Amino acid sequence: MSLFDWFADRRKGQYVANVKQEPDEGDGLWSKCPECGQVVYLKDLKLNASVCANCGHHHRIDSAERIALIADPDSFQVLNADLAPVDPLGFKDRRAYADRLRESQASTGLRDGVVTGLCRVEGIPMGLAAMDFRFMGGSMGSVVGEKITRLIEDSTARKLPLLIVCASGGARMQEGMLSLMQMAKISGALERHREAELLYMPLLTHPTTGGVTASFAMLGDLILAEPKALIGFAGRRVIEQTLREKLPDNFQTAEYLQEHGFVDTIVPRTQLRSTLANLLRLHGCKPMELTSA
């Protein structure tokens, strides 16, 4: 059997990725919690920041919902909204990268997988980036990296603290080295932000993996995480096969990482804005007017 035939067999279903599938969440009016099975009215779930009132499970939310939970009302100013990805490599796997981009843009209304801007949190100005897992798994390509880098540089110039909400499967393979170099570019911008003695906090949400974890997600002065978020670099099964040993059941969860010193604090979504405001005040940040972006 040739190598090509070997891969073809696996594409037919002999190899199944170890991905936990989300259960059906209802018909648009109701949502079923994947953790406890509780069926809840969708409007009630949204009013509770998409957190299950029965078990505390944090449902996945998009970038717009995330920004609304963090920023003071009407305070968010979008930056670099006109940046959009291209296909410099002409990449094609099962489908062309250009087709995947068009599909994600149509389904999400976004140009790429992150929204960046300036906002206030209880009157305190800061830079804010919110990654959106709906857009190609929140993967980090050249536009995601450029928008985050520009936000960091703008926050540094304005002497503002910074929060990046991470939700990503890692570097975008369809862009090859162009995506991988974003790790170093963002890290360099964060170092200049640190040299200016400014506060940077990443918020690790479910999931935060791959090249995002290996770069800016772990470079914060304070590393925050949502409860039970999946956080890691390589997949659990890959690690088990490499080490040839069974990993703990809670391995790569926010709680496991906090226990081992990789996460500073776990913040329930319903307490996020007040917690951020307290942390900003503790670091000497004060309410002030935010000039236009």
From Swiss-Prot:
PROSITE patterns: COA_CT_NTER. GO terms for biological process: fatty acid biosynthetic process; malonyl-CoA biosynthetic process. GO terms for cellular component: acetyl-CoA carboxylase complex. It is found in: Cytoplasm. One of its GO terms (molecular function) is ATP binding. Its cofactor is Zn(2+). It catalyses: N(6)-carboxybiotinyl-L-lysyl-[protein] + acetyl-CoA = N(6)-biotinyl-L-lysyl-[protein] + malonyl-CoA. InterPro entries: AcCoA_carboxyl_beta, Acetyl_CoA_COase_Trfase_b_su, ClpP/crotonase-like_dom_sf, COA_CT_N, Znf-ACC. Signal peptide: none annotated. Its main location: cytoplasm. Gene3D superfamilies: 2-enoyl-CoA Hydratase, Chain A, domain 1. It is an enzyme of class 2 (transferase). A zinc finger (C4-type) spans 33-55. Keywords: ATP-binding, Cytoplasm, Fatty acid biosynthesis, Fatty acid metabolism, Lipid biosynthesis, Lipid metabolism, Metal-binding, Nucleotide-binding, Transferase, Zinc, Zinc-finger. It comes from the Bacteria. Pathway: Lipid metabolism; malonyl-CoA biosynthesis; malonyl-CoA from acetyl-CoA: step 1/1. Residues 29-293 form the CoA carboxyltransferase N-terminal domain. Its EC number is 2.1.3.15. Binds 1 zinc ion per subunit. Zn(2+) binds at residues 33, 36, 52, 55. Belongs to the AccD/PCCB family. Acetyl-CoA carboxylase is a heterohexamer composed of biotin carboxyl carrier protein (AccB), biotin carboxylase (AccC) and two subunits each of ACCase subunit alpha (AccA) and ACCase subunit beta (AccD). PANTHER family: ACETYL-COENZYME A CARBOXYLASE CARBOXYL TRANSFERASE SUBUNIT BETA, CHLOROPLASTIC (PTHR42995:SF5). This is Acetyl-coenzyme A carboxylase carboxyl transferase subunit beta. The gene is accD.
